[in-house]
């Protein structure tokens, strides 16, 4: 074999040398035959005649681009753009080659004459006449046919047979060959083949990309082949791109893309740039809810791109994809229910294939491989103030780094622009090597070398400067760091320095502030791939203009949206709503857009009075308003007239000018010509006040002016809310809650008695309802104690807000000094005296004030009396009610006394609205004002719910700031704490060194004035703790906010709330205020270890030396961030089954020390036989039920594990009454001033915007009460329930406001130590009759189903009938490497805290979902004033509102209330994940998200004692949510599981087995020990004393998995 191969090789070599003549002849013959075969194959190719005259070089271009054709160049026609015109015929033939012969084909915008000449009778051309050029082209094609026929006639020839069918078809039915309609509206042909095709030759530009897929589907197109012109350079910011091969060019102006030929001026085509870019970049073109057209690029030839669009069935994709662990039928159902959302998500994910694969980008853009886009740095010395256009150029990446790497080696002196330019020119030019000219490796345009050199030079200069600064570690000596930088730049640019400096700052390459400098080396280039993605994203975000509107309106709207597009989250801006609102209100969209951008970026100098710049708010803010001024007169009476009362002012409608300016005329005081008296409020319609708009939707002017306008609007909003509530009460007196009836009063004029008697008398104003049932605001006068009523009055409503003319008087006074409707800002010098607690601010005021010519204003009445008392302590009366006043007194009585003072002293001024401070300075006409306050203590709190109070308006603008850093009150240890809060050294004069102590108490039950007396002043953090202490018998208890500014010798600070409180944190101003009220001692009594205990412990450990020095070092710690490596499903490692009962007992005792030693078997008996003192509301007790009936006690199994679990209790009068007091009585009253109806509507709007999918917000027309819904409800009921409905005829209902009451006999275990000191109350069940449930149960079940279907399930989970596996799947896509804030909202007394406002919110949600108005009204009356009857215990009482624990809407109602509460307070648009279940919730936000004061909002608006706290791990419904780099796993709380193993209600062994099965269902994830370490961390975060628990987790798995072993945990 080897020999044969050797001989063959030798013969081959001889042949190559030509030594063998026979072989030579054979080779020549073979070469001839190959040439013949090649020529024959070439002849078999389709023949194309190229008639137009082109150059030889262009001939090569056409031949190489289309080797599939045999092209004959006749060069018999001279024409413009000859190559492009000839190539168009080749392009058409190339497209038609891809289609099976004879298949029905649509030529979109095609040449029907060319198809007729080819005899293609199966082609239909859509040739719409979009402009005159199309008409001309259509006529030219007809002329070409006539010319062809005339030549045949001249030669006496007939139409060839292959053309005759097409010509016959055109003669008989021209519409079947060509139509004048766009392809989107084409009616098509009547007879089609099985598969229909389409071609589009340079016609895609005029078809909107979003309509293309649907248009193809309407014509049943199988595949569409298309060709269009494009250039990669269009993605640069150049306005001109040339196509040299065909002699054409693109020019771009915004979204307008023009295509023209260089030598032709008439052919100019205009297209949409964004539309063309969509065809280039998009992969999928949706056609329907099921089918989509997928684009695939074929080839690029002579500036023309060929692609095809293939029709795909997406149902095949989804039903063919295997999904692990999902039921097939359930998956189909879910896909069909939410198809639109899932389809859009799938399309978006697929569209990114091209954009994320750089190799694909390089393939379709071959010229762009290894090319980068470099900006050209413009350093023009002219037009410094004008904005210069940005320029870019595309060059080789290798060229860029060759230059940069070389010039980086230059020394500092050698690094000049000239040297850089010289080097760039040298490597670009031709060089001579050994006498031979060599071309440069990089072909860079020489016209760009100077600009490129400047970019390279500046980039290198900044980079070297930054490196030098890093090396020198920013050591600055005689000059500042900023001066060094500018010296370097000046040396580099010499006389060009001012322009360069301005350009560097404008482009933000160097950022300079007063004390800081930042150097940012810009990105040298961007890749073509990045630019393609950027252009594509910007194009798809560009809205489609309404072609039905005029061109001018479309251009304005486009410009407006372009302005808005720079804002964050601009993709969520609803263009349709914005356009509609602008048209309705007559607002220029471009003006609205510019205002919005300026306001959001805080560069406008104005403030919009809405919370967020939504579409409607922006349009409403800029709505043109017509203001009308009411003419008024000012009466001036003589100086001998005495001071008139406010009642006289109202009656006479005149204001005394006595003392207004004294007896002298002041030029500084300018009184408005429009003086408003309180009479203007008399008999004004309530609708006028309630609907009265704010001062302006847009606050303009300086910051002080904006603050004044916001303050005036806040007064109007407060008055509006008070009037709205009175109007509601006067129409429905039954709606007054017994808990709040003391705040209101309703007087019946006809009956001459109080229907609801108010607690106080002498109200200044109220709301009146006349005989026509219209409501007005009236200023009240009295005849003795009786109200003087008008003839038409029917009822008068008053409230605690109407006792005085507070808001009315302040509004009158402030409006009276407005100048042309604008606040007048005083030129007085305002000095802020910022002092630490106890620095002697009041003492300083008394020492500096001259009571003869100065004014002292304080926020509270007690503070004013204290200042007067201290000022007059010497016996000489110098401080009076004229020069020492409260702020409210000064504003309400403005004009009744002296109005001009020399100096103003404002104590605790930072607790006031900044606008109020500005008004006080201006109205006092002082020349200097001193505002005393503490910047670290509690600031002004906006107590009008839903009123906008922008953050930047909260900063008081002053002329000077003085600091007081020596405290006269605080001991040394508190001074040490103050040094951590204030700038500068805080000193003290107190002789007390140590003053703090704390005590952890067992629970609120131990607090008693006898057994636990509290020393000194008693202070609490929350109103609920204050109310509890007052009910226990403690006196003189106040909250921290109430005692700010006061001083006490000894303080007892008390916290009885075990759940986290938001205001108790180290950063909270409440903590600072609470610890700085004493001079001698403070003791903290708390039920939990919190931030206060941590601070006090630290202070107790501070050495005496440090207390003398008052020095604090604060270090900053940084978090190391590590990127994830792998993501997937949970890793499973089976847990070893080890451990014993003693392990579980040990773990329980370590977590809850002492609970296992509690002997509570006879607590219920002790409760019955001992004397009890209970705080009971109005109720009826049947004392015959006080002795429970004797019952046989059931025997239960005894648990081996000792926990705090109790035996089931027996219902009775005392037991049920204690449970009712705990669960239903003494509900909190924390709510502020709330306009219930308007605020509820606003809250529901936020609820729907936050949680519901936009497309599904509209209610469905589905009958809520039907036979099917009733049958579904009955299937879920027990047989006993159905038996109760046997005699129900569904015609009449029992009383819907009557409820039954019972208790759950098994006490609920709490995972804390309260069992050691408290007798836990049982849970109650308040429920309707089954007959009522039979009607409303199916209704709300259907409403709940509709609500859950519309919820955005990808981000929110409403935990209804969910399994632990479903919870894991919901949280599985959380990225553990993305920093997140995990928030939990804990609400105490959730059910009984719900009042009228909560009901209004819930009813509004049900109504919007489609609840019938009649059923809604019946349901509403059944939840307002309700009666509870407990037949077992003999108790009857009345409750207002509250959540009923056994209602048909209990669970879903609680869930939507907590969700609505959170959506009204938190930025839900930034939420990553959120879950809600009853009163439990867990939220995942991006790290660093700003949150408002949750406790304040929950108190004032929702009446909730809410605490929002952050955690590292989520805890939801008794389960720990552990998210890791692979996904998420949910572990059941192991401590809760052990607590259940101590249950004392297990009846027998069968019951025990059922108990074990239920525990296995919820705790199955404990069998996976792969994430035990994470579980240890999560448990340790909640329970500080918990040890590492891997051993007990394994023990739990061991006993739960073994049926026999589990039986040993309980004894007979």
From Swiss-Prot:
ATP binds at residues 835-842. Pfam families: RdRP_2, ToMV_Hel_N, Viral_helicase1, Vmethyltransf. One of its GO terms (biological process) is viral RNA genome replication. Residues 965-1117 form the (+)RNA virus helicase C-terminal domain. Its EC number is 2.1.1.-, 2.7.7.-, 2.7.7.48, 3.6.4.13. The keyword Transmembrane helix does not apply. Residues 803-964 form the (+)RNA virus helicase ATP-binding domain. It catalyses: RNA(n) + a ribonucleoside 5'-triphosphate = RNA(n+1) + diphosphate; ATP + H2O = ADP + phosphate + H(+). Residues 831-1086 are annotated as: Helicase. The keyword Hydrolase applies. Residues 52-466 are annotated as: Methyltransferase. GO terms for molecular function: ATP binding; ATP hydrolysis activity; mRNA methyltransferase activity; RNA binding; RNA helicase activity; RNA-directed RNA polymerase activity. Residues 1380-1493 form the RdRp catalytic domain. It comes from the Viruses. Residues 72-280 form the Alphavirus-like MT domain. Keywords: ATP-binding, Helicase, Host-virus interaction, Hydrolase, Inhibition of host innate immune response by virus, Nucleotide-binding, Nucleotidyltransferase, RNA suppression of termination, RNA-directed RNA polymerase, Suppressor of RNA silencing, Transferase, Viral immunoevasion, Viral RNA replication. Belongs to the ssRNA positive-strand viruses RNA-directed RNA polymerase family. This protein is translated as a fusion protein by episodic readthrough of a termination codon. When readthrough of the terminator codon TGA occurs between the codons for Gln-1117 and Gln-1119, this results in the addition of the RdRp region to the replicase. Heterodimer of a large and a small subunit. This is Replicase large subunit. It comes from Pepper mild mottle virus (strain Spain) (PMMV-S).
């Amino acid at each position: 074999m080897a020999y044969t191969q050797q001989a063959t090789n030798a013969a081959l070599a001889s042949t190559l040398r030509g030594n063998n003549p026979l072989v030579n002849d054979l080779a020549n013959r073979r070469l001839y035959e190959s040439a013949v075969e090649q020529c024959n194959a070439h002849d078999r190719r389709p023949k194309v005649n190229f008639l137009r005259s082109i150059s030889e070089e262009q001939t090569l271009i056409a031949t190489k681009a289309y080797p599939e054709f045999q092209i004959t160049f006749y060069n018999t026609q001279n024409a413009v753009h000859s190559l492009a015109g000839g190539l168009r015929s080749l392009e058409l033939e190339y497209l038609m080659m891809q289609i099976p012969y004879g298949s029905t084909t649509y030529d979109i915008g095609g040449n029907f004459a060319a198809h007729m000449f080819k005899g293609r009778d199966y082609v239909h051309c859509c040739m719409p006449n979009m402009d005159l050029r199309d008409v001309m082209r259509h006529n030219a094609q007809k002329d070409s046919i006539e010319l062809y026929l005339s030549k045949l006639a001249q030669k006496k020839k007939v139409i060839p047979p292959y053309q005759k069918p097409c010509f016959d078809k055109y003669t008989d039915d021209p519409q079947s060959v060509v139509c004048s309609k766009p392809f989107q509206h084409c009616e098509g042909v009547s007879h089609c083949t099985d598969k229909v095709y389409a071609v589009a030759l340079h016609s895609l530009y005029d078809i909107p990309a979003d309509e293309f897929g649907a248009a193809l589907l309407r014509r049943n197109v199988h595949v569409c082949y298309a060709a269009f012109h494009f250039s990669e350079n269009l993605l640069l910011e150049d306005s001109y791109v040339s196509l040299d091969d065909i002699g054409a060019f693109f020019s771009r102006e915004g979204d307008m893309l023009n295509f023209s030929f260089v030598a032709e001026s008439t052919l100019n085509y205009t297209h949409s740039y964004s539309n063309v870019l969509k065809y280039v970049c998009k992969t999928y073109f949706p056609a329907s809810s099921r089918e989509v057209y997928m684009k695939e690029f074929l080839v690029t030839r002579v500036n023309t791109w060929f692609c095809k669009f293939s029709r795909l069935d997406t149902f095949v994709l989804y039903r063919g994809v295997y999904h692990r662990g999902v039921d097939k039928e359930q998956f189909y159902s879910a896909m069909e229910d939410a198809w639109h959302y899932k389809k859009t998500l799938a399309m978006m994910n697929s569209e990114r294939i091209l954009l994320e694969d750089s190799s694909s980008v390089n393939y379709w853009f071959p010229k762009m491989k290894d090319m980068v886009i470099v900006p050209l740095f413009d350093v023009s010395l002219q037009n410094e103030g004008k904005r210069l256009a940005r320029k870019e150029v595309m060059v080789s990446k290798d060229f860029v780094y060759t230059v940069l790497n070389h010039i980086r080696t230059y020394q500092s002196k050698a690094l000049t622009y000239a040297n850089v330019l010289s080097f760039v020119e040298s490597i670009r030019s031709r060089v001579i090597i050994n006498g031979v000219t060599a071309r440069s490796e990089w072909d860079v345009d020489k016209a760009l070398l100077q600009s490129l050199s400047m970019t390279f030079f500046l980039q290198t200069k900044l980079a070297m400067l930054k490196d030098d600064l890093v090396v020198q570690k920013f050591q600055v000596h005689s000059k500042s760091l900023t001066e060094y930088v500018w010296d370097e730049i000046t040396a580099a640019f010499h006389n060009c320095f001012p322009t360069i400096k301005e350009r560097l700052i404008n482009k933000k390459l160097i950022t300079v502030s007063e004390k800081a400098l930042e150097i940012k080396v810009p990105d040298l280039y961007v890749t073509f791939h990045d630019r393609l993605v950027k252009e594509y994203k910007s194009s798809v975000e560009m809205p489609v203009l309404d072609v039905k509107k005029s061109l001018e309106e479309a251009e304005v709207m486009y410009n407006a949206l372009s302005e808005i597009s720079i804002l964050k989250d601009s993709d969520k801006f609803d263009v349709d709503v914005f356009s509609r609102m602008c048209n309705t209100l007559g607002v220029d969209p471009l003006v609205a857009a510019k205002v919005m951008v300026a306001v959001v970026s805080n560069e406008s100098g104005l403030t919009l009075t809405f919370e967020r710049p939504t579409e409607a708010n922006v349009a409403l803010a800029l709505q043109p308003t017509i203001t009308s001024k009411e003419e008024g007169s000012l009466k001036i009476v003589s100086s001998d007239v005495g001071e008139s009362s406010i009642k006289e002012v109202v009656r006479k409608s005149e204001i005394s000018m006595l003392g207004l300016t004294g007896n002298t005329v002041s030029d500084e005081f300018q009184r408005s010509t429009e003086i408003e008296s309180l009479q203007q409020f008399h008999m004004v319609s309530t609708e006028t006040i309630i609907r009265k708009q704010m001062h302006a939707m847009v606050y303009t002017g300086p910051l002080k002016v904006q603050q004044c306008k916001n303050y005036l609007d806040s007064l109007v909003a407060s008055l509006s809310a008070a009037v709205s509530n009175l109007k509601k009460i006067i129409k429905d007196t039954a709606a007054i809650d017994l808990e709040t009836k003391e705040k209101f009063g309703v007087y019946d004029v006809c009956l001459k008695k109080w229907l609801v008697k108010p607690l106080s008398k002498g109200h200044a104003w109220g709301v009146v309802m006349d005989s026509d049932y219209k409501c007005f605001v009236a200023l009240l006068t009295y005849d003795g104690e009786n109200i003087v009523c008008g003839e038409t009055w029917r009822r008068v409503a008053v409230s605690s807000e109407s006792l005085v003319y507070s808001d009315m008087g302040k509004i009158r006074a402030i409006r009276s000094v407005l100048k042309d409707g604008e606040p007048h800002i005083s030129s007085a010098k305002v000095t802020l005296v910022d002092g630490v607690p106890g620095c002697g601010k009041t003492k300083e005021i008394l020492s500096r004030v001259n009571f003869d010519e100065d004014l002292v204003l304080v926020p509270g009445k007690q503070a004013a009396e204290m200042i007067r008392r201290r000022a007059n302590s010497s016996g000489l009366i110098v401080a009076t009610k004229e020069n020492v006043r409260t702020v409210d007194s000064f504003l309400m009585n403005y004009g009744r006394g002296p109005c001009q003072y020399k100096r103003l002293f404002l104590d605790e001024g930072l607790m006031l609205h900044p606008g109020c401070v500005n008004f006080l300075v201006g109205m006092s006409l002082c020349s200097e004002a001193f505002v005393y306050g503490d910047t670290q203590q509690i600031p002004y709190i906006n107590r009008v719910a839903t009123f906008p109070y922008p953050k930047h308006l909260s900063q008081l603008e002053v002329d000077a700031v003085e600091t007081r850093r020596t405290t006269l009150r605080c001991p040394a240890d508190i001074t040490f704490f103050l040094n951590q809060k204030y700038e500068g050294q805080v000193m003290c004069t107190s002789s007390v060194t140590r003053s703090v102590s704390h005590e952890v108490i067992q629970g609120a039950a131990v607090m008693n004035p006898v057994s636990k007396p509290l020393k000194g002043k008693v202070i609490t953090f929350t109103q609920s703790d204050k109310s509890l202490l007052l009910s226990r018998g403690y006196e003189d208890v106040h909250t921290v906010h109430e005692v700010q500014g006061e001083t006490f010798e000894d303080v007892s600070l008390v916290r009885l709330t075990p759940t986290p409180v938001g205001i108790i944190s180290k950063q909270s101003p409440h903590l600072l205020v609470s610890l700085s009220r004493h001079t001698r001692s403070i003791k903290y009594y708390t039920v939990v270890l919190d931030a206060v205990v941590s601070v006090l412990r630290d202070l107790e450990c501070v050495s005496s030396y440090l207390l003398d020095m008052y020095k604090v070092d604060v270090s900053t710690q940084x978090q190391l961030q590590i990127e994830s490596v792998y993501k997937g499903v949970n890793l499973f490692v089976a847990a070893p089954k080890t451990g014993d009962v003693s392990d579980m007992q040990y773990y329980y005792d370590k977590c809850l020390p002492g609970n296992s030693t509690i002997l509570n078997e006879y607590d219920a008996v002790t409760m019955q036989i001992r004397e009890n003192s209970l705080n009971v509301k109005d109720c009826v007790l049947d004392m015959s039920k006080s002795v429970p009936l004797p019952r046989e006690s059931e025997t239960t199994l005894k648990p081996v594990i000792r926990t705090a679990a109790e035996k089931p209790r027996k219902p009775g009068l005392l037991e049920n009454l204690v449970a009712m007091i705990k669960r239903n009585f003494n509900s909190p009253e924390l709510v502020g001033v709330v306009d219930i109806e308007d605020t509820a509507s606003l809250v529901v709007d936020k609820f729907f915007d936050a949680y519901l999918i936009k497309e599904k917000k509209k209610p469905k027309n589905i009958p809520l009460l039907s036979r099917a819904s009733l049958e579904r409800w009955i299937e879920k009921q027990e047989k006993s329930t159905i038996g109760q409905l046997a005699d129900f005829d569904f015609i009449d209902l029992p009383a819907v406001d009557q409820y039954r009451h019972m208790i759950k006999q098994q006490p609920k275990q709490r995972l804390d130590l309260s069992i050691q000191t408290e007798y836990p109350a049982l849970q109650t069940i308040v429920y309707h009759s089954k007959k009522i449930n039979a009607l409303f149960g199916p209704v709300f079940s259907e409403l709940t189903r509709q609500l859950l279907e519309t919820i955005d399930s990808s981000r929110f989970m409403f935990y209804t009938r969910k399994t632990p596996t479903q919870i894991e799947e919901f949280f599985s896509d959380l990225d553990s490497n993305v920093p997140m804030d995990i928030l939990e909202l804990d609400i105490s007394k959730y059910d009984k805290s719900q009042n009228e406002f909560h009901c209004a919110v819930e009813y509004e949600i049900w109504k919007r979902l489609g609840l019938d108005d009649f059923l809604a009204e019946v349901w509403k009356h059944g939840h307002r004033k309700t009666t509870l009857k407990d037949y077992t215990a003999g108790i009857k009482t009345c409750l207002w509102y509250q959540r009923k624990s056994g209602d048909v809407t209990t669970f879903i109602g609680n869930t939507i209330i907590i969700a609505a509460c959170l959506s009204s307070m938190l930025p839900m648009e930034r939420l990553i994940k959120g879950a809600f279940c009853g009163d439990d919730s867990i939220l995942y936000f991006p790290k660093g998200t700003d949150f408002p004061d949750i406790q304040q909002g929950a108190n004032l608006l929702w009446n909730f004692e809410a605490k929002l706290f952050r955690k590292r791990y989520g805890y939801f419904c008794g389960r720990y949510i552990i998210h890791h780099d692979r996904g998420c796993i949910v572990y059941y709380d192991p401590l809760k599981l052990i607590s259940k193993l101590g249950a004392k209600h297990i009846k027998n062994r069968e019951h025990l087995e059922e108990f074990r099965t239920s525990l296995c269902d919820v705790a199955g994830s404990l069998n996976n020990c792969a994430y035990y370490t994470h579980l240890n961390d999560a448990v340790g975060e909640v329970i500080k004393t918990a040890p590492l628990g891997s051993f007990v987790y394994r023990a739990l798995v061991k006993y739960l998995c073994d049926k026999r072993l589990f039986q040993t945990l309980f004894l007979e």
